[in-house]
């Protein structure tokens, strides 16, 4: 089942945290989930070229904190912070006047971010680059940047073929069943003249010991 379950959801509460962190009663839960979806969709569409990997949302009463992880913070922030201010006003309007605070975090090594790697491969496929070339170049960059393993998969009418198929390449280790393994997962779609091509990426960065286990090991060493 390790091949089927979402690598991030599988590790929630162990080495990963939720991207949306808030509590709501039954009456507000549906509204907040829809609001989170609209916030993420708006940011991704508005700042598609900013290399946004992940958007975290925290709520407290009428305040909403949005944390944007991006490879190009300059595009998000804009000249003298004009981009952030404009985005904040748009999100306040989207959420019905709630107080929005934005926190921009830079992704230091975008070659090790699975979502950005998948989007990069998809962008190349839209430019008619060979899918094999795009996948192998992305894998080589990730391994050079320190990844311990990477797997990329593309699915659809590859090269304009009449029959859709799936192809994948793998380098190094991808221990999907090991819960302490820090495996990043990303998915993107390439919109080509032949139809959509799905791109999936798994990147293994090493092991993360859960805090309790790490603390007990540290105590045992003494």
UniProtKB/Swiss-Prot annotation:
PROSITE patterns: KH_TYPE_2, RIBOSOMAL_S3
SUPFAM superfamilies on file: Prokaryotic type KH domain (KH-domain type II), Ribosomal protein S3 C-terminal domain
Entry annotated with the keyword rRNA-binding: yes
GO biological process terms held by the UniProt record: translation
GO molecular function: mRNA binding; rRNA binding; structural constituent of ribosome
GO cellular component: cytosolic small ribosomal subunit
Span of the signal peptide: none
Pfam families: KH_2, Ribosomal_S3_C
Residues annotated as domain KH type-2: 39-108
Keywords, comma-separated and alphabetical: Ribonucleoprotein, Ribosomal protein, RNA-binding, rRNA-binding
Highest rank taxon of the organism: Bacteria
InterPro entries tied to this protein: KH_dom, KH_dom-like_a/b, KH_dom_type_2, KH_sf_prok-type, Ribosomal_S3_C_sf, Ribosomal_uS3_bac-typ, Ribosomal_uS3_C, Ribosomal_uS3_CS
Similarity section: Belongs to the universal ribosomal protein uS3 family.
Function statement: Binds the lower part of the 30S subunit head. Binds mRNA in the 70S ribosome, positioning it for translation.
Assembly description: Part of the 30S ribosomal subunit. Forms a tight complex with proteins S10 and S14.
Protein name, as recorded: Small ribosomal subunit protein uS3
Source species: Caldicellulosiruptor bescii (strain ATCC BAA-1888 / DSM 6725 / KCTC 15123 / Z-1320) (Anaerocellum thermophilum)
Higher taxonomy: Bacteria, Bacillati, Bacillota, Bacillota incertae sedis, Caldicellulosiruptorales
């Amino acid at each position: 089942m390790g091949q089927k379950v979402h690598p991030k959801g599988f590790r929630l509460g162990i080495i990963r945290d939720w991207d949306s962190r808030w509590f709501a009663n039954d009456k507000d839960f549906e509204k907040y989930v829809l609001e989170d979806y609209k916030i993420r969709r708006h940011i991704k569409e508005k700042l598609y070229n900013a290399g946004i990997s992940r958007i975290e949302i925290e709520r407290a009463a009428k305040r909403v904190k949005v944390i944007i992880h991006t490879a190009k913070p300059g595009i998000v922030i804009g000249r003298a912070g004009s981009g952030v201010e404009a985005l904040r006003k748009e999100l306040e309007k989207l959420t019905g006047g709630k107080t929005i605070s934005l926190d921009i975090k830079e992704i230091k090594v975008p070659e090790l971010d699975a979502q950005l790697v998948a989007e990069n491969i998809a962008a190349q496929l839209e430019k008619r680059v060979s899918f094999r070339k795009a996948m192998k170049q992305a894998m080589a960059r990730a391994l050079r940047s320190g990844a311990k393993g990477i797997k990329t998969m593309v699915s659809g009418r590859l090269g304009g073929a009449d029959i859709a198929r799936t192809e994948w390449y793998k380098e190094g280790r991808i221990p999907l069943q090991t819960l302490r393994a820090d495996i990043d997962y990303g998915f993107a779609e390439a919109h080509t003249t032949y139809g959509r091509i799905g791109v999936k990426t798994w990147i293994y960065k090493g092991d993360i010991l859960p805090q309790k286990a790490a603390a007990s090991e540290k105590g045992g060493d003494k």
